[in-house]
Amino acid sequence: MDTNRSLYEIEVALAKHFEYLKNIVVFNVVGWGADVPVEHECDCLVISKSGYLTEIEIKRSWADFLNDFKKTHLKREDSIKYFYYCIPEKLSEKAYDKLDEVIESNKDFDYSGIILYDENLNITVGGKRIKSFFDPGKYSYINNPIHYNKLYLEQKLAIARLGCIKTIKEKKKIIDLQNKDAISDVDDELLISDDPE
């Protein structure tokens, strides 16, 4: 791993950055159903108050980042306005170089930018790297929309519902772990009480 931060820590930092109290922020969404506007697994989806959809692929290592380009689909659905990779800060230059290479070889691929996080979970949003027209050795960075389609109310609700389902499943896991720990504590008490002195 190129970070010591857990996936959950990164998700919480992203949710805060994208103002989860104002916008709909959901994680690990698998697109299915007539009203869900994505047809693949998404690490993070953000629906803005104005109805636009942002997809974020979260990567914790360089190998994980490279694996993304082995997927058969690199083109994003028309429903996604912004598409970002979220990576450890120290991978920034290598990632931009790789994205330039992928764009050269695959004209269907596009992205809006890179979101960087450091070990303190500070989030920085960087735009898509564009070579300067006047000075080929220089770059500019823009947050590049890849589509401009707003979501319908039914689509927003479908994504929010998937987020709620995911939350309930996660809470169930926590309860199961707590119950397992409670059973383990009881087992420890039995072992201690059986211990002859």
Residue ranges with predicted function:
Residues 11, 55-57:
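Acidic-residue sensor for enzyme active/binding pockets
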Residues 34-39, 124-127:
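Short, solvent-exposed polar/charged micro-motifs at secondary-structure junctions
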Residues 30, 45, 57-59:
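Anionic group-transfer/hydrolysis microenvironments
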Residues 34-35, 45-46, 71-75:
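Short, flexible, glycine/charge-rich loop motifs used to bind or transfer phosphoryl groups or to couple energy/partner
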Residues 1-37, 48:
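Acidic-basic catalytic patches of nuclease active cores, encompassing PD-(D/E)XK
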Residues 2-3, 12-17, 100-197:
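Non-catalytic C-terminal interaction segments of nucleic acid-processing enzymes
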Residues 53, 60-117:
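Catalytic cores of nucleic-acid endonucleases
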Residues 37-55:
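Active-site beta-strand-loop-beta-strand hairpin of nuclease catalytic cores
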